[in-house]
Amino acid sequence: AIANAPLLDTTITDRVFFD
């Protein structure tokens, strides 16, 4: 996922950083 776009991309990578 794109860490800069947690609202646009909610894959596991964003969940790790933005949960």
Swiss-Prot record:
Name recorded for this polypeptide: Thylakoid lumenal 25.3 kDa protein
GO cellular component, one term: chloroplast thylakoid lumen
Entry keyword set: Chloroplast, Plastid, Thylakoid
The keyword Plastid appears for this protein: yes
Protein's UniProt keywords contain Chloroplast: yes
Originating organism: Spinacia oleracea
Subcellular location: Plastid, Chloroplast thylakoid lumen
Domain of life assignment: Eukaryota
